[in-house]
Design a protein with these regions (language model features):
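Cytoplasmic helix-loop-helix junction between adjacent transmembrane helices
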Residues: 115-153
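Short amphipathic helix-loop junctions that connect adjacent transmembrane helices
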Residues: 39-52, 249-265
Length: 433
């Protein structure tokens, strides 16, 4: 039924055979999306856009991405995931073309806001549409593994391999041409996923009574106060990656202009940071099952990120452009971001009768982090500087450490009984940290 690579190995790896090409397409798409993540900010500043305007541009992009992340599941129910993915690919390609052919050459900031901001709708529709597709196709017994491979491809591309591609292309073809290469990668990945995946029964996610599109959309907001623990979990998810998206704005500038690293060195640090994160995602999933989800989130996520965020600033600040030391703290920061992985299982378990709404609320938190981080930078980097922004992010992580203690489950072990309940299988479909 599908045009896919050999199935035996794929099946053993836990990848649904009919969707195998989709994983490859997702990886290429996210590599293309991640190419700019380590250098677009300094590139625009070099072209005369102020630092605060760049931060605002990234904030608008994040708002669009957050909206698309929230809507992707509902639209997949209405249209089917394939159509949602086509929509995401088309949005990304059209507005990237506008950004490259008009906004950048004309140095028009309003046009940048329109083209780059609306392009932010693209990748969540494509990626999370595919995530819903996986949830509808993968056998329940292997759903967690299938979702693990999804996040491996997602974070492997954005920003890990994307930054490596940029570090290799920029010295050879320049920064502007590298943005065109990103478009080519996104187009190639999108077409591979959408043309080579020929699955006939994964178009729509099954819905239970009361879980229609409108009910899920409205309920994903009202559940935040109907069940305050879900609201707390969503807030913790916002904090989880807020610093990551804020650092995309200020850290390339800080590490290259203040600390003294070259742009290539910074891109290598960024790649190492999120390469560590990829494997730490798998590790903390296991740790959460052993230690308990809430404790893992609080100590490895909240407390860990509080420390690693400060180290990421102060170690290079004191040691200067010492690449091995910077590599260590960058890897430590990337690993601690993954300490929030058990949120994926915990939050839907807090609302067992409306897991779809809890998942949408968690995705809302994930999407919100993409603009909260740049917004913190835009508001505070002027009056407080980079150091002040770092302390704000560290303080947010300390707050998440405290909030995590309110995410109490009836079964604090949170593993054996939850794993035995078939209803919790859908928890794997939520966005990991």
């Amino acid at each position: 039924m599908t045009n896919s690579p050999p199935r035996s190995l794929i099946t053993r790896l836990g990848i649904p055979p009919t969707l195998a090409w989709g994983y490859l397409g997702l990886l290429l798409f996210m590599i293309g999306d991640g190419v700019e993540s380590g250098y677009l900010s300094p590139y625009l500043i070099d072209r005369g856009v102020s630092e605060s305007r760049v931060a605002l541009l990234f904030t608008v992009y994040g708002i669009a991405a957050g909206l698309a992340a929230w809507l992707s599941g509902v639209l997949s129910d209405l249209w089917g995931p394939r159509r949602v993915m086509w929509t995401g690919l088309a949005i990304w390609a059209v507005f990237q073309l506008l950004f490259l052919t008009a906004a950048i050459p004309l140095a028009g900031y309003p046009l940048m806001m329109i083209s780059y901001g609306l392009r932010g709708l693209g990748y969540p529709l494509f990626a999370y549409g595919f995530l819903v597709w996986i949830a509808g196709v993968a056998p329940r017994a292997r759903l967690g593994t299938a979702m693990g491979w999804f996040w491996f491809a997602f974070t492997g591309g954005l920003p890990t391999l994307g930054s490596l591609v940029a570090s290799g292309l920029i010295p050879r073809i320049g920064s502007y041409a590298t943005l065109w290469a990103a478009l080519a990668l996104v187009a190639a990945g999108g077409l591979i996923a959408l043309l080579l995946v020929r699955d006939d029964h994964g178009g729509r996610r099954p819905r239970g009574a009361g879980d229609g599109p409108l009910a899920t959309l409205v309920g994903s907001v009202t559940v935040l106060w109907r069940n305050p623990r879900v609201g707390v979990g969503s807030l913790v998810r916002v904090i989880n990656t807020a610093s990551q998206f804020g650092f995309f704005v200020i850290m390339p500038i800080h590490f290259t202009r203040t600390v003294g690293f070259s742009l290539t060195q910074w891109l290598h640090l960024l790649s190492a940071m999120f390469a560590t994160n990829i494997f730490a995602n798998l590790l903390f999933g296991v740790v959460g099952d052993r230690l308990g989800w809430r404790r893992t989130i609080a100590w490895f996520g909240g407390a860990g990120c509080t420390v690693s965020t400060l180290l990421l600033f102060y170690v290079p600040h004191v040691a200067g452009p010492n690449f091995p030391l910077a590599l260590l703290v960058a890897a430590f920061y990337g690993a601690t971001l993954a300490g929030y992985v058990p949120l994926s299982a915990l939050v839907p378990t807090l609302e067992p009768k409306h897991q779809g709404q809890a998942l949408a609320a968690l995705n809302l938190g994930a999407g919100a982090s993409t603009f909260v981080g740049p917004a913190v930078v835009a508001v505070f980097v002027g009056p407080l500087g980079v150091e002040g922004v770092i302390w704000i992010f560290a303080g947010m992580y300390a707050v998440s450490f405290l909030l995590a203690h309110f995410l109490q489950l009836p079964d604090e072990a949170g593993t054996a009984r939850a794993a035995a309940d078939p209803g919790t299988a859908t928890a794997a479909a939520s966005a990991p940290a």
